[in-house]
Amino acid sequence: MNSSKNPPSTLLDVFLDTARNLDTALRNVLECGEHRWSYRELDTVSSALAQHLRYTVGLSPTVAVISENHPYILALMLAVWKLGGTFAPIDVHSPAELVAGMLNIVSPSCLVIPSSDVTNQTLACDLNIPVVAFHPHQSTIPELNKKYLTDSQISPDLPFSDPNRPALYLFTSSATSRSNLKCVPLTHTFILRNSLSKRAWCKRMRPETDFDGIRVLGWAPWSHVLAHMQDIGPLTLLNAGCYVFATTPSTYPTELKDDRDLISCAANAIMYKGVKSFACLPFVLGGLKALCESEPSVKAHLQVEERAQLLKSLQHMEILECGGAMLEASVASWAIENCIPISIGIGMTETGGALFAGPVQAIKTGFSSEDKFIEDATYLLVKDDHESHAEEDINEGELVVKSKMLPRGYLGYSDPSFSVDDAGWVTFRTGDRYSVTPDGKFSWLGRNTDFIQMTSGETLDPRPIESSLCESSLISRACVIGDKFLNGPAAAVCAIIELEPTAVEKGQAHSREIARVFAPINRDLPPPLRIAWSHVLVLQPSEKIPMTKKGTIFRKKIEQVFGSALGGSSGDNSQATADAGVVRRDELSNTVKHIISRVLGVSDDELLWTLSFAELGMTSALATRIANELNEVLVGVNLPINACYIHVDLPSLSNAVYAKLAHLKLPDRTPEPRQAPVENSGGKEIVVVGQAFRLPGSINDVASLRDAFLARQASSIITEIPSDRWDHASFYPKDIRFNKAGLVDIANYDHSFFGLTATEALYLSPTMRLALEVSFEALENANIPVSQLKGSQTAVYVATTDDGFETLLNAEAGYDAYTRFYGTGRAASTASGRISCLLDVHGPSITVDTACSGGAVCIDQAIDYLQSSSAADTAIICASNTHCWPGSFRFLSAQGMVSPGGRCATFTTDADGYVPSEGAVAFILKTREAAMRDKDTILATIKATQISHNGRSQGLVAPNVNSQADLHRSLLQKAGLSPADIRFIEAHGTGTSLGDLSEIQAINDAYTSSQPRTTGPLIVSASKTVIGHTEPAGPLVGMLSVLNSFKEGAVPGLAHLTADNLNPSLDCSSVPLLIPYQPVHLAAPKPHRAAVRSYGFSGTLGGIVLEAPDEERLEEELPNDKPMLFVVSAKTHTALIEYLGRYLEFLLQANPQDFCDICYTSCVGREHYRYRYACVANDMEDLIGQLQKRLGSKVPPKPSYKRGALAFAFSGQGTQFRGMATELAKAYSGFRKIVSDLAKRASELSGHAIDRFLLAYDIGAENVAPDSEADQICIFVYQCSVLRWLQTMGIRPSAVIGHSLGEISASVAAGALSLDSALDLVISRARLLRSSASAPAGMAAMSASQDEVVELIGKLDLDKANSLSVSVINGPQNTVVSGSSAAIESIVALAKGRKIKASALNINQAFHSPYVDSAVPGLRAWSEKHISSARPLQIPLYSTLLGAQISEGEMLNPDHWVDHARKPVQFAQAATTMKESFTGVIIDIGPQVVAWSLLLSNGLTSVTALAAKRGRSQQVAFLSALADLYQDYGVVPDFVGLYAQQEDASRLKKTDILTYPFQRGEETLSSGSSTPTLENTDLDSGKELLMGPTRGLLRADDLRDSIVSSVKDVLELKSNEDLDLSESLNALGMDSIMFAQLRKRIGEGLGLNVPMVFLSDAFSIGEMVSNLVEQAEASEDN
């Protein structure tokens, strides 16, 4: 601890003096959200951490840290210093390859990282570096206080730091690979002295300010020198101040967490948190300026009073420093005008922060050498030509710093920038270029580089061009340089050519050849970077390009030697004139040629007439100049400024000018007013029936899309690129010219839904993840269950482009990225293939990349396929675009395609490029015939599509007006439409000035017609102004916009367009056109039609014509109070609960009149997954109530069973009642037909009115006398009708049981009897068992055991004529007796006298007793007659005759039906057998719930009934049974077939309901290991168990665990991933290769054979495990 008598020697001493001083100890030192630390608390916590760290790594450790700024990390830094150690913070966004290099350089004692950082945990393990993982949620200020404030104060044996020891290891930000990593060691002494110097400078800047206790707004990462040498040292610790987090760490739990962007958070803190110091980068100050001025580019807008408050707060800041890069002049001017005290700091890590600092005016005036921060430093400028020079005063050169305090060099990296003399003076060459003003101030000019910086923002590396030029045999040496040389940004690129001696001898002939060398180079360069011939200097033989002694171009001397030659103009400057009265083609051509020759500096006629303008080096500026000069010289000509892009060479431009000047009418390429459509091969119309999308701004549904378009919400959709993507600040604005984009969530993904393990999902590119999601969701939007497509010829077309994911993978994992998932996870071809594979569809599966027209190409290819295929009627179209790596953004910046302001200001005077956006869109296309068949909702009809190419234009990426106009014409012709038939056009509309002009010209060329537009002006919309440019998905976003306009009846206005800023160069009068800035209503006539246009930088053009759907005809509304089945399903129980919650919200807002359609769609329009909910509701209110009840229940949903576990139970006689089939027959035509046909047949054969009894509508006739003969037939007909009806719905039993008479129906279901034979048997049996009037008989049911009933019979003194016998044993306390009517009366009376419940049945025969012996001969005769028609059982029959199971494949005994009528019914025994051997649900098929009740009484709990008790709704009971079967037992009826049977089926329609709630989890390389590793878990123990055939040593449970471990191992599940044993291997993503590995593993390790059938979806993993355990047990028994 520092004594108060001695000055502090380290910042740690300063901190301890404050923390242990009674006057300052309780001051706040740190504020994070609502949490605060005092100096004393931080001292205590850091001491405790030091003690813990000491036990881990000892004294004087080097502790590396990879984490965002976090309170725990600051405490840790102090702890490391208290141990005498070195703190090495590493940028959290550094790629893994660089992190590995950094760790090798610093050789840390340990690496401290958040517990969630699996990637760096793996990396550290690979490098054998101990890891200390902290849990961010357990490391908050309150949690650390709770844990450590009770600890004792710092122990006296902590050594503290040697002032001359490195306190920090900081890496520079310039590294591009491990080879140039530079680590700067900064000692405690150096840090303290520089901090003191910086504080002294602050006081000089603000002498009136008391800095004591200042509140400092902290933002800079602690891996950056700015954080330590500005925020922490000079301002916080040296002033006993408080460090305030500008943004709360992402992992820090706090109630005050602010999700706003950095600029908004900083502004909020400056206004309301009392901060007085803030150090930041230029873009932050630019953002604050934009907030103050409410610029349209800012993410969040302030109210007028808030803007005033922010400006006032900025004016009262004490320190507001900008570092890291030079401040924009506009921001500097704004600060000066508004008296905002901005200061500028220029420095680098090697110098411990700023070298110079000064007020904002220093940008222009320079920095005083007095404002240096290294006390003993000397600054001087040196020559930068790498040659020796004597010491002399120079006014410009590289800055060199000389000081004894500077670091002695980089750690572990030898660099000539540092040198140390014998006296200990360190000389450091900064690599920065400065000039010295006459008054001795230093002005920063930039870095010493060879790159050419253009005024247009592009940066050009001249060396590749120089190399290409030197490949010519004519050129000896070439130098490419900007026209400003080294004096600033260049407006043009120049070339100096030194010829080979042999070329010089050819004289003038070389000029033409050299021009041809430039042609292909210029053709491939963006227009601003092309080298015009007027900027090419070909040297004379005596002239040479200056070179250094090292053989490199001496670029500094270029201006001195050739400046005047390159700066002069070439050619004749006199202007040509033309006589407006007489136009001669030859004179006009010469005039045009003369102007082009002079502007381009090309005098060779052959070159002018044979090369394109691009090949001649024409830039955008030169093209504009030529158009303006031609307009000025040639009276009567009014060429657009992009004329040279429309007419791409001299001959075509001359012809166009001649035609305009001579008032010639060019060939009319506009189609006739109406043409017959071009016939497609199949004559099929294609319609859109489904859509889904993921767009920036969380635009994921039609409501949010509509709101975004109508409100023109671009400012909330296009946002700053966050740090969790990449460190964008390190690229902006030098390499990437924009800092905003439209981004979607690419980190979170529901991998298990798509059958992927977490490991495989990590390798799946976000582009493909989104494609999968939207494709599946589009099918749901179209109400197409995915299983409906299985095995079909459905096609899949996906448009993608390079998303940088492969680069990210390789950067993250290096060679280790090449796992078995590498290819399939990132190859573009698998984007479509994966969708086809998951859906099991067999049509074309094609991935397209034509850049920004990809989506349109997919639509076109799909339509060709659907119209030409006789086997297909559906196609899935998708386009997906993400940006995982900043490389494409740099490409766009270099091409000049993007807007520095981050917007698409299409068709405005502000148009300066587009803003890239991410997004994915999917559409479902069907033939109209199929859509009408399936009752689909049609969103639009696709009238025509067309794909073409620009051909040769001003370069590959340049637009071609003629080609675009031809595309429009072709579309109209294919659609058979005139221009007037198109109401609006969704433009490509990227917002580039040249592209906008070309697009409008093409529309004018194609749509200008001699016939006036009676429908009003042609409206031009541009969705990119709101959404941004989603590139390959752009055409599909355009389609979304059109569909939205069709639905809303209005075209949205363009964002960024106002009433005053429409580009005046756009011709809106010819067609005419309307480019709206507000929504425009679409008036009649209908149908509305629109064209969608797209253009890829590949040159591929795409166009689509869409027609709005017919208006829905108003039909009589369905009653909204009828019973309807409502179902919901999900793949996990958490998803199901979320789904139900979302449905509750949805239904509360829904129209009650839509109740039936919602329920119908839930059944027929969704896939049915394993976790289910189903209910029967009568109206919307009822449905909402049932959902609320379910959500209020705490019982988690369970997965449904397999479909095979289903048995039918058939009731016997006594369950019948008049009209028992009436209600279901009325409700369902399918059942009505089945029961009517069978009843009619039975009536004809039996002579009884079976149909009238079953379908009687006078069901009030209760007192109908029993007729056992007719009753038996009725029961049979009813139950067999229900059986057949269920079978038509796909509900089939896997086992059956029949009570008495019901066993005949059961035998039909089991396949033992045909329906005809069974009907004949029932009729014959009923006739044979007919009751006798002379011997009246009956049956009675008694609530007593069989023994008790036998005892009762014995108590009666009965003669043979009035005998009784037990005829049915239904259960332990349910026995039925048969006998004479008198005997029945007697035993019932006796039982009641003994308090035994007993009642006579409504039957007039004593079945299953000696009373039916007279029927035996006749039944035996029937059996003998039909013995040849007997068939083996197809499913098990639990016989109530035998009380046992008759297995599948067995035949019934020939006397089975004889014994069946005569012998007692052993239902209880049969039920017991069923309980022991059958697992699943049993459905009571009977007309009343008798079998259901009997089964329950015998202990079978999984029972449901299709019928209700008499007097209750049979339809509700039936639907309730279906709900039960669906929810709990995995039964999926044919809902489409069921609903088609309803009387009002034609009025049921599919409607929009909720789509699946994906359970997304984070799947990013930054948060998970990129190379799968196995932790020491059960997985590893499972592996040990399988090191040989050890099966015999394992118990069943161990064997089961070992098999499960093997499955998890092969699936590469992470340790925290559960294995759902109820799922199939296939559903979890196991392919045939993986299955072969599993079979080998279990076969070699356990000696067990895994049957191939377990790879199918028919079996679960649990069933496979059980099979293998049984296999092992059987093997042991043998």
UniProtKB/Swiss-Prot annotation:
Disulfide bonds: none
Pathway given in the UniProt record: Secondary metabolite biosynthesis
Example of a GO biological process term: fatty acid biosynthetic process
Regions of compositional bias (Polar residues) in chain numbering: 1564-1576
UniProt entry keywords in alphabetical sequence: Phosphopantetheine, Phosphoprotein, Transferase
Domain (Carrier) ranges: 586-661, 1597-1672
Reactions listed under catalytic activity: (E)-caffeate + 2 malonyl-CoA + ATP + H(+) = hispidin + AMP + 2 CO2 + diphosphate + 2 CoA
Matching CDD domains: PKS (cd00833)
Region called Adenylation (A) domain, residue ranges: 33-453
Uses, biotech or industry: The availability of a complete eukaryotic luciferin biosynthesis pathway provides several applications in biomedicine and bioengineering.
Residues found modified as O-(pantetheine 4'-phosphoryl)serine: S620, S1632
Catalytic-site annotation from UniProt: C852 (for beta-ketoacyl synthase activity), H988 (for beta-ketoacyl synthase activity), H1029 (for beta-ketoacyl synthase activity)
Region of interest: Malonyl-CoA:ACP transacylase (MAT) domain: 1201-1499
UniProt-listed InterPro entries: Ac_transferase_dom_sf, ACP-like_sf, Acyl_transferase_dom, Acyl_Trfase/lysoPLipase, AMP-dep_synth/lig_dom, ANL_N_sf, Ketoacyl_synth_C, Ketoacyl_synth_N
Role played: PKS-NRPS hybrid synthetase; part of the gene cluster that mediates the fungal bioluminescence cycle. Performs the biosynthesis of hispidin from caffeic acid by two cycles of addition of malonyl units followed by lactonization. The fungal bioluminescence cycle begins with the hispidin synthetase that catalyzes the formation of hispidin which is further hydroxylated by the hispidin-3-hydroxylase, yielding the fungal luciferin 3-hydroxyhispidin.
Record-stated family: In the N-terminal section; belongs to the NRP synthetase family.
Free-text comment on this protein's domains from its UniProt entry: The architecture of hips is the following one: adenylation (A), phosphopantetheine-binding/thiolation (T), beta-ketoacyl synthase (KS) and malonyl-CoA:ACP transacylase (MAT). Hips homologs in bioluminescent species lack two domains, the ketoreductase (KR) and the dehydratase (DH) domains.
This protein's name: Hispidin synthase
Native organism: Neonothopanus nambi (Agaricus nambi)
Lineage of origin: Eukaryota, Fungi, Dikarya, Basidiomycota, Agaricomycotina
This protein's encoding gene: hisps
